[in-house]
Amino acid sequence: MKRQALIGLFVLAASTSFAQFFRPAPLNEAENYELKMGKVTMRIDAANGARITSLKHDTTEVISQTPQPNMYGSTFWTSPQKEWNWPPVREHDIMRYDVEQKDSVITMTSQLSAKIPLRIRKQFAVDKKNECIVVTYSIINEGEQERKVAPWEITRVPAEGTIFFDAPLSAITPAGLMNFVEKDGLSTFDIDQAEKQRKINADGKGWLGYRNKGLLLMKRFQDLTPEQPAPDEAEIQVYVHQGKVYVELEEQGAYTTLKPGEKLDWAVRWYLQPEKSKRKLY
């Protein structure tokens, strides 16, 4: 019997202790919103970059809750990174987003970047038919010149569990940096620890999976050809922070030219279910 999708949408008042539980010293006091679908709850903090700070199935959390200033939750950047270097653009990554709610859809819009003239819009909605949460990102060129840009979602999860995607081992670069193995036709990485930061690139098939604590998180997005990502970037990236801190599940969209006033839209579909669920996601 198909599960009934239930939508719950409301603002959560944030106490100081609540904010500290999710991260230390936020830029602003948290302004949290929630989407609910059956047993899945997604929480978004509009006051701090419109980040996804929590994703739970019942009471089991899949987003990393390890305290890391500014390096927490699921965020969004523009690609390639060389356009802004480091740190990430504050208006996109950590500053407050304006919020609009309509028909059980949450839309959050960034301030215009002082570094690059791009505005980010994030729309969060429940897809009842497919039992997932859809996050649609928009990049809007509000400058006076053409810009080439790609969308980039970064999701931080605990440094445990298994990451997998559909790509040959030979296509993962740099080779040998992480202990990926072939299992059931997929490239699979049981997260381990090392005293250095590691990051790999791969050309996948439009999805990225993560298993931990008996749950399966699946993110689905546009499948790219090897020529479509931004220069020196990739459709799928995995970053492992040194030690046992957090891991980033990253995916990018196509490198696109935006004329002044134009925008691009890019959707990521989030599925979360018990690993032993009968529904097949890959």
Role assignments for model-derived ranges:
Residues 20-38:
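Short N-terminal segments immediately surrounding and downstream of signal-peptide cleavage
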Residues 21-23, 27, 81-130, 148-149, ...:
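Extended, loop-rich substrate-binding clefts of extracytoplasmic carbohydrate-active enzymes
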Residues 1-21:
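Bacterial Sec-dependent N-terminal signal peptides
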Residues 32-93:
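Acidic-aromatic substrate-binding/catalytic surfaces of carbohydrate-active enzymes
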Residues 272-282:
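Terminal connector regions
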Residues 120, 133-135, 264:
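Hydrophobic core residues within well-ordered beta-strands of beta-rich domains
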Residues 40-42, 50-53, 61, 131, ...:
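A contiguous, surface-exposed recognition patch within enzymatic or periplasmic domains that forms
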